[in-house]
Amino acid sequence: MYTQSLDIPGNVAPLDAAAESPEQARFDAVMAADGKIEPQDWMPDAYRKTLVRQISQHAHSEVVGMLPEGNWISRAPSLKRKAILLAKVQDEAGHGLYLYSAAETLGVSRDSLIDALHAGKAKYSSIFNYPTPTWADVGVIGWLVDGAAIMNQIPLCRCTYGPYARAMIRVCKEESFHQRQGFDALLSMMKGTDAQRAMVQQAVDRWWWPVLMMFGPSDADSVHSSQSAKWGIKRISNDDLRQKFVDATVDQAKVLGVTLPDPDLKWNEARGHHDYGTIDWDEFWRVVNGDGPCNKERLATRVKAHDDGAWVREAALAHEAKRQARAEQHAA
């Protein structure tokens, strides 16, 4: 969903200043042709490090992103909604696994990436550090959060790094379903009682501005986007993606019957887009830097789940060791 740390100062190594080599020339030719780099191909160290940071942050976000909604699995209002939510949370876990696998093709270990997350050295999307106090929040996550994720992720299907691009094709298909189920859940609530409609509106009020922050800092403050664009990692700027999302969401909100909490939101005929209010970037940076409503809770929950699941990983390794031993005996 979720690659905000690419725009955080200091997160990307500077480009090598060495004279261009034949390998660099081949890499540049692939970039110029808008081709694909595969794991066995030579690539600049800065390109590799940028991808490791982006893909690992994306993977961390998928895994941590299970928590706000997973909190509601046991309290879903119906068997149908519970089954849908179970499937969705399972999908998010799968997305994390796809993306960790893609990161591993760059020569890093999954354990090292997870250790960095648990130590607080790696980032995940700031959006998952907000609470989900009502069932309507689950629907709004599907509609707005996953809707913003789709807007961010579709261009990644054309990323120049092959394993990442291919993983994103499946992820985007599943995220599209998540967005539709979130909207459907809210639509059902909006057909209900006054209390249910009020609950939906309150959830929209809570999530609208944090969702707009998901696209990352304004282009003027995005220190690494230019190089990522040259490498074909970042295809569309933060502000352009945010604008596309706002334009698409306004009509959806009208169908749903909710009001987006921005008094400055209005159509600008001259621009052909909606104008919207000023985002509170101070809040964004507070949450990114660990001072959000749920940062400590989210990280503690992930660490506990990882520790509690150690026996599963150990059992899987023991089973694989036995399987290999039996295979060697049969081959002898």
Can you describe what each PLM-predicted range is?
Residues 1-43, 47, 310-332:
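Extreme N-terminal leader/anchor segments
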Residues 2-24, 88-116, 183-186:
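Conserved alpha-helical segments that form or flank metal/cofactor-binding pockets of metalloenzymes
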Residues 3, 7, 198-332:
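Extended, helix-rich structural scaffolds rather than catalytic motifs
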Residues 36-56, 116-142, 159, 192-196, ...:
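Acidic/His metal-coordination segments adjacent to aromatic residues that form catalytic metal sites
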Residues 42-47, 65-87, 149-164:
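Helix-loop segments that flank and shape redox-cofactor active sites
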Residues 47-58, 77-95, 138, 163-175, ...:
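Alpha-helical scaffold segments that form or flank carboxylate-/histidine-based iron centers
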Residues 130-181:
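Internal, conserved structured core segments that host functional sites
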Residues 159-209:
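Glycine- and acidic-residue-rich phosphate-binding/metal-coordinating active-site segment common to enzymes
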